[in-house]
């Protein structure tokens, strides 16, 4: 539906897509959190030695996805999917009209949902760390702070040196 929405579907069909997203998200949630999947994952994990490296990694990813999705209440999972659809439609229009204010409430709701989801994923982590771990496993703000501090210590003096160099006469470019 997303591909259809961003390529070929008429812009005024977003509400219908939202209803479809609601139905599909509910089905996806039920399938994704089905106890039978838990049994299958447990079986594969118990027989890990029989799996090739690719399948082992796929099982790890599936387990993580299963565990994370299961932590989110179904109604919030569904509501978030519908919100994403609605926000996409509003963003497209707001972008074309240079009207961020129209999109701002949707962005705020998306951020609120993600903060809530971060608490479900790991209540003991800072929300940003919990969400960052979703996309960059093992990375956290402490590591990023150290990285950017090191980067800053090299870049700031470099910029200062660049500023000290006399400007090149480029006036011929503008004749």
Q: Model-derived features: where do they sit?
A:
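N-terminal helix-rich structural modules
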Residues: 1-107
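Contiguous, non-catalytic segments that form substrate-binding/exosite surfaces or channel walls
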Residues: 80-175
